[in-house]
């Protein structure tokens, strides 16, 4: 499928969309070295060799921004690689396998190699890498198939540079959100307000995702202690997202930026109910501490935040799943994601099996369609 697909689209086809995948990870053929040609001559000279520029080997190991916790069985699905290429590096193969094969009508791309970009100590280097990635993604993926959509990457270390990148990229065809790699500063802090203002101004949601750098680097996002094993880290990812969600709500970010939207990708979902209940209960007795939070915290959560399904919860008793969906208001806040090409990929044909058909449709299509608006068409 090529860009000719876009010309062939009709209103009838757009109305028949069935599945929107909110978390797909494209990877670069030679790791970060792939981005060197997308940088200015000065930046190529300054950091090109450090990114592996000029080498043929994948260079993510020269600058370890992710995968610090190693899955001994492999982090990728073995079948997601075309012969001679690494997983999810070929947009044609990915389109055939994921979009055609799984019946996915829109796939939102979140930068695979840059999940840990927010932990980098040099803001200018991080911003340069983000900008180069955005140009590469548009050229390599978004122009290839009309079904791909992209999250433009920003480096959160320097809000001014991040805003410049948002302004530069916001009108590019296929861009539907801003992918903000997590940083050491919780998301409710004033540090991010210029970014939120730009996101609201352009009508672009902010999306965050686990980084793989948690607690390892000085500027990485924080868990309650540093896990030793991959299985620990993977099971505890919700800690990061609980902390950031509470920060957004308690700092009154959605009062200050009422049109701002935030997506928590791959952060778990069962904790949503408990956190919302606790914040609502405490808000009644502690409102004097946060007078800018004028409504129940859960009201802002339900209106301004969305959460992706993968890795989907698997309770021992299947009937508990329906109860959980009701507790977290899944018919409004939950959006389907596959996490392709990772090892724990959720297949849309069975990931939500057992849920009522109407709820499945809400999660797989209606919720993301309403959330992203016309940009997803």
Task: Identify what each model region corresponds to.
Residues 1-377:
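Helix-coil boundary/capping segments in enzymes
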